[in-house]
């Protein structure tokens, strides 16, 4: 997934930013084009906006230092899902995009070596 600086647990902001960079790299490796990051909407932020083929993906990135509080995917609950859908609608209204929009979650868990174990889930809410 590319070289990242060795990370330690206990620095959530740094860990989250590194996770978003790692997620963008993973998505590029899997054929997605990252077209936006950090879109601020009234109901929250879209971590990554990607395109693959004729589909736009709204990607939530969840980075964890361990699994003591559940998996990264489990952290995307009903409230976050509603916020993502509302932010996606706002993004569509402000952009020229008229094609299909789908959702994805990239879950990253910090490893003992300072890298990440990564999991990409498309359509996690279906």
Residue map of PLM features:
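Solvent-exposed beta-strand sheet faces enriched in polar/charged residues
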Residues: 38, 62, 104-106
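Short, charged, amphipathic alpha-helix that recurs within catalytic cores of restriction-modification
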Residues: 75-94
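Domain-level recognition of nuclease-like catalytic cores that cleave nucleotide substrates
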Residues: 94-126
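Short acidic/glycine-enriched loop/turn segments that link adjacent beta-strands
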Residues: 42-44
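Hydrophobic residues on conserved beta-strands that form the core of alpha/beta folds
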Residues: 34-36, 58, 103
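Conserved catalytic cores of phosphodiester-cleaving nucleases, focusing on short active-site segments
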Residues: 27, 46-72, 76, 84
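Acidic-basic catalytic patches of nuclease active cores, encompassing PD-(D/E)XK
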Residues: 1-37
């Amino acid at each position: 997934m590319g070289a990242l600086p060795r990370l330690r647990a206990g620095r959530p902001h740094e860990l989250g930013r590194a996770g978003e960079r790692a997620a963008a790299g993973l998505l590029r490796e899997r054929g997605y084009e990252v077209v936006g990051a950090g879109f601020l909407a009234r109901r929250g932020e879209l971590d990554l906006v990607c395109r693959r083929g004729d589909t736009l993906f709204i990607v939530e990135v969840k980075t964890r230092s361990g699994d003591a509080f559940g998996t990264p995917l489990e952290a995307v609950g009903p409230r976050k899902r509603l916020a993502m859908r509302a932010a996606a609608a706002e993004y569509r209204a402000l952009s020229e995009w008229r094609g299909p929009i789908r959702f994805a979650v990239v879950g990253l868990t910090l490893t003992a070596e300072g890298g990440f174990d990564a999991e990409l889930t498309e359509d996690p809410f279906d």
